């Protein structure tokens, strides 16, 4: 696995692979990798001949009071994980390499409806930052396919819409959420949890799972169901950002008649914000 830091080096390496007839896959990350990221890269290696991973902590997608300055930087460990997972090329640009003209006047990519509400409500500008950096990476690499985790369900929906609407010839693949044995979705931010918070954290997915089970059993009153689960989470020590049942494609509010929904949640334990979801399709 080679590691490059400049767009010029990245494009040259990808061009060599493409000249050899190789199918190119891209997996963007912010580093501090865990086994969920490794699963994305391993899936990319199954689907393509040449796997590009990126590690870039993107300032555009962090709000003013978020953890940009403290987000863990673990490059050496990340390189080892990527190598073991089957990565061929790692791109680790600086902020100056990604935004050579500064960020104040940077062209932004906006996916209006899907970026609003849910995480977009509490993290204004976040999805513009995500869509902008991902579109830049897509232009730099021009992959045949790109793989993203379904844990960030709203992000995946935003990227799918961007690719569709801007006619990008890239296949977007969602990979199922990787979980700890107790059900907690793996996240780079789980390391912020103290021992007591880590013990409480699986209750978030349990509430989502119970919501899905109730819907599958025929529950029609979504409002009452969500109110009950919010109270359950608050009793477990969570501060709720949102717990919603939405249409799985549009992410718009939905009703019990909808057979394809997603249950999405974001909640704080202490200062750590956890997100999770469950896609529920009923026949």
UniProtKB/Swiss-Prot annotation:
The keyword Ligase applies. Pathway: Cofactor biosynthesis; (R)-pantothenate biosynthesis; (R)-pantothenate from (R)-pantoate and beta-alanine: step 1/1. GO terms for molecular function: ATP binding; pantoate-beta-alanine ligase activity. Its EC number is 6.3.2.1. Beta-alanine binds at residue 61. It is found in: Cytoplasm. The keyword Hydrolase does not apply. It catalyses: (R)-pantoate + beta-alanine + ATP = (R)-pantothenate + AMP + diphosphate + H(+). ATP binds at residues 30-37, 149-152, 178, 186-189. The active site is at 37 (proton donor). SUPFAM superfamilies: Nucleotidylyl transferase (SSF52374). Keywords: ATP-binding, Cytoplasm, Ligase, Nucleotide-binding, Pantothenate biosynthesis. (R)-pantoate binds at residues 61, 155. It comes from the Bacteria. Belongs to the pantothenate synthetase family. The reaction proceeds by a bi uni uni bi ping pong mechanism. Homodimer. Catalyzes the condensation of pantoate with beta-alanine in an ATP-dependent reaction via a pantoyl-adenylate intermediate. This is Pantothenate synthetase. It comes from Pseudomonas savastanoi pv. phaseolicola (strain 1448A / Race 6).
């Amino acid at each position: 696995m080679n590691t490059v830091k400049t767009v010029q080096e990245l494009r040259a390496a990808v061009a060599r692979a493409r000249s050899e007839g190789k199918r190119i896959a891209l997996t963007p990350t912010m580093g501090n990798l865990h086994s969920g990221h490794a699963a994305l890269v391993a899936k990319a290696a199954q689907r393509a001949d040449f796997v590009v991973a990126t590690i870039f902590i993107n300032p555009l997608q962090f709000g003013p009071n978020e953890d940009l300055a403290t987000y863990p930087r673990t490059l050496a460990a990340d390189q080892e994980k990527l190598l073991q997972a089957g990565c061929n090329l790692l791109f680790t640009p600086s902020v100056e390499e990604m935004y050579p003209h500064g960020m104040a006047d940077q062209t932004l990519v906006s996916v209006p409806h899907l970026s609003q509400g849910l995480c977009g409500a509490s993290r204004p500008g976040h999805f513009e930052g995500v869509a902008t950096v991902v579109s830049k990476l897509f232009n730099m690499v021009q992959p045949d396919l790109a793989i993203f985790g379904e844990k960030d369900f709203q992000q995946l929906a935003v990227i799918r819409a961007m690719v569709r609407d801007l006619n990008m010839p890239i296949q977007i693949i969602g990979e199922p959420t990787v979980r700890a044995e107790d059900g907690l979705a793996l996240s780079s931010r789980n390391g912020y949890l103290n021992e007591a918070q880590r013990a409480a954290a699986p209750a978030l997915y349990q509430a989502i799972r119970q919501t899905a089970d109730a819907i599958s059993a025929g529950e029609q009153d979504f409002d009452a169901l969500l109110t009950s689960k919010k109270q359950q989470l608050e009793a477990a020590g969570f501060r709720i950002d949102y717990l919603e049942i939405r249409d799985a494609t549009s992410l718009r509010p939905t009703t019990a008649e909808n057979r394809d929904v997603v249950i999405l949640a974001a909640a704080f334990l202490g200062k750590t914000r956890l997100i999770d979801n469950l896609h529920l399709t009923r026949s």
